[in-house]
Amino acid sequence: MPSVASAAVPTPRRPFRTRLVVAALATLAVLAGCSEGATTTVSRQSPERGTPDAGAAGSELSWAGCTDDMAAAAGLECATLEVPLDPAQPEGEQIELALARKRFTGPDDQRIGSLVFNPGGPGGSGIEFLASAAVMVPQELGDRFDMVSFDPRGVGDSSPVRCIDDATKDEQLTGDLSPDTEEELQRAIEDQQEFIDGCRTNSPELLEHMSTADVAADLDRIREAVGDETLSYVGFSYGTSIGSVYASLFPDKVRALVLDGSVSPDAAPEEEVIAQGRGFERTLQSFIEHCNADPECALAPDAAGTIDRVRAELAQDPVEVEDPTGTRAMGSDLFDLALGTALYDTTVWGTAARAISDVRGGGAELLFALADQQTGRQPDGSYDNSSDAQSMVACADQEERPTLEAGRAAAERIAAALPELGQTFAWGALACLDWPEAANPLPRIDAADAPPILVVGTLGDPATPYEWSEEMTAALGSARLLTYEGDGHTAFLRGGPCVDDAVTAYLLDGTLPAEGTRCPAQEDSVSFAGLRDEIVSQFVDIGLPQQVAECVVDGAIGEVGEVEFDRMVLTRDEELQAIVQQHSMRCALGG
């Protein structure tokens, strides 16, 4: 949300989105190639078992093919589930949740149940996530679990909330996102009040029922609806808050919980802002060090100096770019938002470096694409509702309501604590200024009575610093910590075989990694070669022959150009899906 809470480096927590987009494109590439007689197969796309609406015994859901193109291409089925608006009144007003599943592919007698995923946010669509991630999940899990995800209440297709319109979001995001004068601060406060008033007007019913505790209650209804006695769950980033609250409220309903990239279990707002700011500072320093040591990095040998110079230039003279909605201006605040987004995923470090070095060439388009990943802006200028939901959840969870005076004092302390990003994060403690009172704030995290839980923490995680995973492990009272020594946000499905094998073993039979297990960063986890090589590599991983993968990617780049190709990947542009399918069919036929 653009407001006094809006740090130019983002607070929403969404894992490895670019990798998910690539996985989705790879799925389309494989399917398109197979449709033209190619021999390549992807076992995770095997024909589904059972009838189209089949579920586990006791399931109350009616499953049917998804209508979304990407979900349908991934072989997902969709359903809706009614849940109470207020979990404390189960017979009261109901709302609808949108669910999706990918059916298990192994023998019927080997099925364990459903494995539910949440991608984080708050505000992340689980259905969009599953459409991309299903093909990345280890085969051993796909053989034995129905993979299930959902759009949490208020998000995506689940009774979506909406606070302000697209034009107002554009206007607020072009304002000053890190106010440093009284006039700028008052404008930011006015923007926040406009946002809150919009939530009250457009989504009054959900305004008081968007807390994580409410979502945890929905998760238990999903468990019941799919017919499972106990829950198997993987939560990334903010999804760890859902999982930890679930384990605290329903410890006897837990089978296996993986919490990857934990949020803080109990930090006060100011402490949370400082910890996250330090996480981004550490990862920015890692980006700079890796860049300076790599001759392929466009910012080498002085990445820090170039970043500072470009930021200063944009503060004085923003770069204007034309898009379908008109003229957009890339200033220093949106530049920091784009840079912060890039720090989430080492996959895009090379692209970000090239964009910064050529900001007045084609780079601004790529920087906008990175910033738009966080704000939810689509290529046509519309917005999804992720930022609306993110703000509503954050303030529904937070019991405190700051005063402006306390916020000013906190801003000074935050700025002093963060030498590199202090002004960017300074006003984060005022995120819930003037919000309605929280009806159902976060409960105390304590799951000592639950079965063992697996927490995964990444040393170089900017958005959910490693120490939060340590704190979550201690707070749960029943958890084991697995450490990934790399950079980026979260580790499962991106941290290599060491992480994936440990998580898979735990989900299959409850086997925890040994106390103190640390997985080393993959040798190729950081590359400044750009998206082309990364995409080819992932296409090969998913089942395309090397020659075909290179043919598809190079054909797409040749058609639209490298900068536009990277932009389309970063923005999940639907036109790129058609381009990839076209070249997949051509390359499968030897064209």
What spans do the regions from the language model cover?
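Catalytic-loop region of hydrolases
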Residues: 2-4, 13-14, 19-22, 34-177, ...
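Catalytic histidine neighborhood in serine/cysteine hydrolases
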Residues: 99, 476-490
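Conserved acidic catalytic loop of the alpha/beta-hydrolase fold
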Residues: 201-205, 216-230
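Conserved alpha/beta-hydrolase "acid-adjacent" motif
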Residues: 462-467
